[in-house]
């Protein structure tokens, strides 16, 4: 509640001995510039104005700048972390300039994950495993 501090970021993930939820709940939602506080996350889920986590925000900006139409498309998000996977899946499904997409969330335990990826119009890999998605897994575009 220090008026001299405008905002701050809790660098996630935290070490295992630190209770991440306890830390996130201690954040003043008005100063949570990463959008991880449950209040801000809830606002994002309701498509209300709030801070958006940095990486999902960057993905949305890339889609805008490259004029990639997402409306009515099938998006597969690989990863379900509250840092990238869940927020981007919410944003891609929300109404807006970038969004209005049908979203499937896959993860490391999804059986036959390749079959989901091959059906997708847009694939967002947030699994944290470099090179996980291979060229032959992507749907061919005519």
Describe these PLM feature segments.
Residues 9-75, 113-116:
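Anion-binding alpha/beta catalytic cores of soluble intermediary-metabolism enzymes, centered on
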Residues 1-4:
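An N-terminal-biased, well-structured beta-alpha scaffold segment characteristic
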Residues 49-141:
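Glycine-rich phosphate/diphosphate-binding loop of Rossmann-like nucleotide-binding domains
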Residues 8, 141-142:
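Cationic, amphipathic, low-complexity alpha-helical segments enriched
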């Amino acid at each position: 509640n220090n008026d001299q501090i405008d905002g701050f970021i809790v660098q996630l993930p935290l070490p295992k001995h630190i209770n991440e939820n306890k830390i996130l709940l201690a954040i003043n939602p008005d100063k949570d510039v990463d959008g991880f506080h449950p209040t801000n996350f809830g606002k994002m889920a309701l498509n209300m104005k709030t801070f958006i986590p940095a990486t999902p925000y960057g993905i949305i900006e890339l889609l805008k700048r490259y004029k990639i139409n997402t409306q009515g498309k099938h998006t597969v998000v690989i990863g379900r972390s509250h840092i990238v996977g869940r927020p981007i899946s919410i944003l891609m499904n929300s109404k807006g300039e970038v969004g209005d997409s049908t979203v499937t969330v896959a993860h490391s335990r999804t059986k036959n994950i390749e079959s989901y990826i091959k059906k997708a119009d847009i694939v967002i890999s947030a699994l944290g495993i470099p090179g996980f998605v291979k060229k032959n897994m992507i749907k061919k575009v005519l």
